[in-house]
């Protein structure tokens, strides 16, 4: 079920806006076609302006921007030759008022707010397993599987921020599920199931003297198929 952004704002506020993620799904019965999904427990439509980038990586490690067709509140694109797709999504600024209500306004627009947060979402979809799948690709945030996944067997996942391993990052099925923390080498284990898998991670990005928000939350979703 899909809900409009207006309904989400009225009913759920920023707590769920923060918990939402973006990920890629294949279009049913259309080979090489994909759609960018957004949501938490249910998928939701989103304004095109919030989708900041969809980039495709080929077998040679070359990146290019996808040609996106936005329809029915979701982004669609073709990627017949891509090995990996990277997504960046900015969910705006949400401010908590003294009443406890969240509104989609900046700190400047709601100066009485006690908290203003900018939720950023990243998605990485591994479409084909080859040498590129186990490499990093110079992204600000990235989850890198250290081997091809096998259903039911623990998989080491390297977590990088600006190319460097980071310790203490939550990695799991999602915010509402159990998670593992990355170790001193930036590695956390995840046990995939047969079929389609989502691997979630959460980061905190420091904010100083920003006129629009006091906090930036970063959530990441890695997706792949396992046999």
Which positions does each model-derived feature cover?
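Start-of-domain marker
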Residues: 20-77
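Short acidic/polar inter-strand loop motif in beta-rich domains
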Residues: 90-98, 206-210
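Beta-strand-rich domain onsets/edges
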Residues: 20-31, 97, 101-155, 177, ...
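N-terminal signal peptide c-region/cleavage motif recognized by signal peptidases
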Residues: 14-16
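Glycine-centered loop-to-beta-strand initiation motif
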Residues: 71-74, 182-195
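Short beta-strand segments within Ig-like beta-sandwich modules, predominantly Fibronectin type-III
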Residues: 65-69, 178-183
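Short amphipathic beta-strand segments in non-cytosolic proteins
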Residues: 55-63, 169-179
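Short, ordered, surface-exposed loop/turn motifs in non-cytosolic proteins
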Residues: 47-51, 163-173
